[in-house]
Curated annotation (Swiss-Prot):
Gene that encodes the chain: S
Annotated region (Pre-S), positions in chain: 2-163
InterPro entries: HBV_HBSAG
Organism encoding this protein: Gorilla hepatitis B virus (isolate Cameroon/gor97) (HBVgor)
Any Gene Ontology CC annotation: viral envelope
Role, per record: The large envelope protein exists in two topological conformations, one which is termed 'external' or Le-HBsAg and the other 'internal' or Li-HBsAg. In its external conformation the protein attaches the virus to cell receptors and thereby initiating infection. This interaction determines the species specificity and liver tropism. This attachment induces virion internalization predominantly through caveolin-mediated endocytosis. The large envelope protein also assures fusion between virion membrane and endosomal membrane.
Identification of the protein by name: Large envelope protein
């Protein structure tokens, strides 16, 4: 049994094939059968002391192999002391004191000398001390040979860092304005087409608008009268309608601007005073009666009678332009004066009439919204002009 060279015994259960660390069976000599420290098989029945008490470990060692500890012999092996530290000289050493400037840069000691300034007249020597783009003055300042104060570390050198928040807001503001302007422009460009659709729908009540030019001498495919191709006879009428619509929008913006300027007091419109023939605008320095209040804008109108003296009256804060237009139109169109009693009567109506008007507006509101919806993009522009002008 012990001569079986083909049977491995890594755990030491068999008497002739025990694991022996001293024999180095695990490293250089893997042959378990030529272990010189083998026990005879009859001694395996004897009771040995063992490492864990009597009878727990056979004399040959069993699982523990052949070792003094397996035979119950406890030997105290002193531990080797730790090696002396070899890192005592490592780490950051103190910075040595810098040598004097006269030893490291002897040429710096001559910067303030006359010979050095004469040598600077040579472009080749000057290029060594003043590179391209540097100072062009003829005075050179040597580096002092003493260390500067520690507070100089925190001192400013050069231009301060730019404020990124202000730069971002400076770019973000114009971009937002540009985006809002482009959005309003795209919406405004749809106003003529929407008004053109509403205009052409008046000719096709109860049906879909169809271009009437498709059955003429130059027939085209079925299309809307608001999108006629250039070869369609209705193309000229479409351009004419849109031109009128553009003029109407321009007139609307002009009226709003005039009302706004008048409301701000920047449009000196003088109402016609009964009994006066001429009016003029200007400062009230030569007037016999001063206007009430002071403002940076023209705030008074001067009437000049025949005697040469002028009388100043305040310009109304609002609706002066409307009053001027009404008076101007009443002088040239006498029939407009007949509307004044009707307007006064309408303004003095009872609340019941006003409620009926409100109910009618509620009933016709959706249709009015469809008519006025193309003008909604103009409202933000009017609001901005009203606030910032």
């Amino acid at each position: 049994m012990g001569q079986n060279l083909s049977t491995s015994n890594p755990l030491g259960f068999f008497p002739e094939h025990q694991l022996d660390p001293a024999f180095k069976a695990n490293t250089n000599n893997p042959d378990w059968d030529f272990n010189p420290n083998k026990d005879n098989w009859p001694k395996a029945n004897e009771v040995g002391v063992g490492a864990f008490g009597p009878g727990l470990t056979p004399p040959h060692g069993g699982l523990l192999g052949w070792s003094p500890q397996a035979q119950g012999i406890i030997t105290t092996v002193p531990a080797n002391p730790p090696p002396a530290s070899t890192n005592r000289q490592s780490g950051r050493k103190p910075t040595p004191i810098s040598p004097p400037l006269r030893d490291t840069h002897p040429q710096a000691m001559h910067w303030n000398s006359t010979t050095f300034h004469q040598a600077l007249q040579d472009p080749r020597v000057r290029g060594l001390y003043f590179p391209a783009g540097g100072s062009s003055s003829g005075t050179a300042y040597p580096v002092p040979d003493t260390a500067s104060h520690i507070s100089s570390i925190f001192s400013r050198t050069g231009d301060p860092a730019p404020n990124m928040e202000s730069i971002t807001s400076g770019f973000l503001g114009p971009l937002l304005v540009l985006q809002a302007g482009f959005f309003l422009l795209t919406k405004i460009l749809t106003i003529p087409q929407s008004l053109d659709s509403w205009w052409t729908s008046l000719n096709f009540l109860g049906g879909a608008p169809v271009c009437l030019g498709q059955n003429s001498q130059s027939p085209t495919s079925n299309h809307s009268p608001t999108s006629c191709p250039p070869i369609c006879p209705g193309y000229r009428w479409m351009c004419l309608r849109r031109f009128i619509i553009f003029l109407f929008i321009l007139l609307l913006c002009l009226i709003f601007l005039l009302v706004l300027l008048d409301y701000q007091g920047m449009l000196p419109v003088c109402p016609l005073i009964p009994g006066s023939t001429t009016t003029s605008t200007g400062p009230c320095k030569t007037c016999t009666t001063t206007a009430q209040g002071t403002s940076l804008y023209p705030s008074c109108c001067c009437t000049k009678p025949s005697d040469g003296n002028c009388t100043c009256i305040p310009i109304p804060s609002s609706w002066a332009f409307a009053k001027f237009l009404w008076e101007w139109a009443s002088v040239r169109f006498s029939w407009l004066s007949l509307l004044a009693p009707f307007v006064q009567w309408f303004a003095g109506l009872s609340p019941t009439v006003w409620l009926s008007v409100i109910w009618m507006m509620w009933y016709w509101g959706p249709n009015l919204y469809n008519i006025l919806s193309p003008f909604i993009p103009l409202l933000p522009i009017f609001f901005c002009l009203w606030v910032y002008i």
